[in-house]
Regions:
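FAD-dependent oxidoreductase catalytic-site/capping-region signature
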Residues: 2-3, 118, 124-173, 179-182, ...
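Conserved redox-cofactor binding core of oxidoreductases
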Residues: 105-225, 231, 294-316
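Glycine-rich loop(s) and the adjacent beta-strand/alpha-helix scaffold that form part
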Residues: 23, 27, 35-37, 218, ...
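N-terminal glycine-rich phosphate/pyrophosphate-binding loop and immediately adjacent elements
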Residues: 1-122, 279-280, 290-299
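Short, hydrophobic/aliphatic alpha-helical segments
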Residues: 60-77, 238, 450-457, 494, ...
Length: 526
């Protein structure tokens, strides 16, 4: 078959692009390096615990040792499966703030303001409460309420209100400041990923999906991308398309593939013996991510997941509840309660996000503590720190160097200190007093600004939102223009979280789906 388009990466963006282009009559080849999403833990909400760190579903990346994290290297999960990160993420439906997108437009990116992107969010949305000025219904991307509540989280919400945050039922109206329960991408207690939502619902026969197909490089002829060379189960194959190729391999994979293809910083490519096809210094630069500071407390006389799952009977009860009703802890998103607040009065819109969980543990992947506990992870939504993604070898199988450069600016360290102080102030409010909270992370020993900045380096970890590594911009230095076309190369658009010029003020999965909706519209309009 002669392909009109090849899409590299069947993740959050690629699956959307595949459906929109193929249903418009284009012949589309969708390539995914991972396997099919038939692993049962992909679809059970709590299954992220078994997908992250699993080579069946995760690229198993690690960061470089980070000076801002006191020399620690972090695990850096990315989805390697149909659906990409939407198959292993926290399922939270969050758009960010109107100010994020209006800021993009003010940077010269015409068509990317809040009023421009809101219809794109609504297009794919299937909102549990139906259509409204802010929400869509009948789309592929299901948004539901969570299927359980916790008294301890209700009390944390009251504490946040006592501290000064307004209660909210909807973080997605353009101004997300407030506290409330997150809404999630689930349907009837099952995870909704983009493979299920978009690829499986595609009508017609113009879409072909190939899994276990890892792209080695783009094929570039006379300044135009015309196809890809990929490995599929040990066999090298080549595919070509007559129209544009869409690179949707994510904020790590897209710059890596470009660099392997000879598109990127010239010195880096030459260092690894790769012929420079098109020098573009910013490919892989500008990495932005949200760093979460895991603040945690031991509680007295509280029902939390720690205590609920402490016995075999408790675990059996949890499993039975999910099997019979699709409710209970197995239907949980990793974080149930959320809040958006400002780190200081000088900040115009919320720059902190809380992910609040009725559980504590020493580190991700380790057992829950044997006492009642609550975690309130707080992250800086608009970091100043900028990192880099760079190939380490001409071999496509070698992981790139990922250096987020967390807490590398005075401003980011100051926000981290303010975030820890604020989390303590909320826990000190009267609604939480009955639990006699005892801080275990970072711990009461850290009190001065200098001590808390050090503590941020000890408890900080990624919240899995890498972006901006192949940014769009009105300036000629940006790899992409506002149409997501690659400057200086024909036949190529990049469509994923890497294209953001600045990270959004919230979780990044739904903005990535919006970007794909807009990209498909632009491509189909010619």
């Amino acid at each position: 078959m002669g392909w009109n388009h090849i899409i590299v990466g069947a993740g959050s963006a690629g699956c959307v692009m595949a459906k929109r282009l193929s249903e418009a009559g284009r012949k589309v080849l969708l390539l995914e390096a991972g396997g099919r999403d038939n692993y049962h833990w992909v679809h059970i909400p709590v299954g992220y615990l078994y997908c992250i760190g699993n080579p069946r579903t995760d690229w198993l990346y690690k960061t470089a040792e980070e000076p801002g994290l006191n020399g620690r290297a972090l695990l850096y999960p990315r989805g390697k499966v149909l659906g990409g990160c939407s198959s292993i993420n926290g399922m939270l439906y969050l758009r960010g703030q109107a100010a994020d997108y209006d800021g993009w437009r003010q940077m010269g990116l015409t068509g990317w303001g809040w009023d421009d992107v809101l219809p794109m969010f609504k297009r794919s949305e299937d909102y549990v409460e139906g259509t409204s000025e802010m929400h869509g219904a009948g789309g592929e991307w299901r948004v539901e309420n969570q299927r359980l509540r916790w008294d301890v989280l209700d009390d944390w919400m009251k504490a946040a209100e006592a501290w000064g945050l307004p209660a909210t039922r909807d973080f997605n109206t353009g101004d997300n400041e407030g506290v409330g329960y997150f809404r999630v991408n689930q349907r009837n207690g099952w995870r909704m990923n983009t493979a299920k939502a978009f690829v499986r619902t595609t009508q017609g026969d113009t879409l072909s999906v190939e899994t276990q197909a890892q792209v080695k490089r783009l094929v570039i002829e006379q300044g135009r991308v015309v196809g890809v060379v990929y490995d599929q189960r040990g066999t090298e194959k080549e595919a070509r398309c007559s129209g544009e190729l869409v690179l949707s391999a994510g904020a790590i994979g897209s710059p890596q593939i470009l660099q392997l293809s000879g598109v990127g910083p010239g010195a880096l490519l030459q260092k690894h013996g790769i012929a420079v096809q098109h020098e573009q210094p910013e490919v892989g630069a500008n990495l932005q991510d949200h760093l979460q500071l895991r603040c945690a407390w031991r509680l007295k006389d509280a029902l939390t997941l720690n205590t609920l799952s402490a016995t075999l009977w408790g675990k059996a009860k949890i499993g039975l509840e999910y099997a019979l009703r699709r409710t209970g802890p197995m239907s949980m998103a990793p974080s149930q309660m959320g809040a958006f607040s400002r780190s200081s009065e000088r900040v115009e819109t919320a720059d902190l996000e809380y992910h609040v969980q009725p559980l504590t543990l020493e580190a991700f992947g380790q057992p829950l503590h044997d006492f009642p506990g609550l975690t309130a992870s707080v992250c800086n939504l608009r970091p100043e720190s900028r990192g880099v993604v760079e190939i380490t070898s001409p071999d496509y199988r070698e992981a790139p160097r990922i250096a987020p450069n967390y807490l590398s600016t005075e401003g980011d360290r100051a926000v981290a200190v303010a975030a820890i102080r604020q989390s303590r102030e909320i826990m000190a409010q009267m609604p939480m007093a009955k639990y006699a909270p005892e801080e275990i992370k970072p711990g009461p020993a850290y009190q001065s600004d200098e001590e808390m900045a050090k503590a941020a380096g000890e408890v900080g970890t990624t919240i899995f939102h890498p972006t901006c590594t192949v940014r769009m911009g009105a300036d000629e230095a940006a790899p992409l223009d506002a149409q997501l076309r690659f400057r200086g190369l024909g036949g190529l658009r990049v469509v994923d979280a890497s294209v953001m010029p600045k990270i959004t003020s919230g979780n990044t999965n739904s903005p990535t789906i919006m970007i794909a909706e807009k990209a498909a519209e632009m491509m189909l309009a010619g």
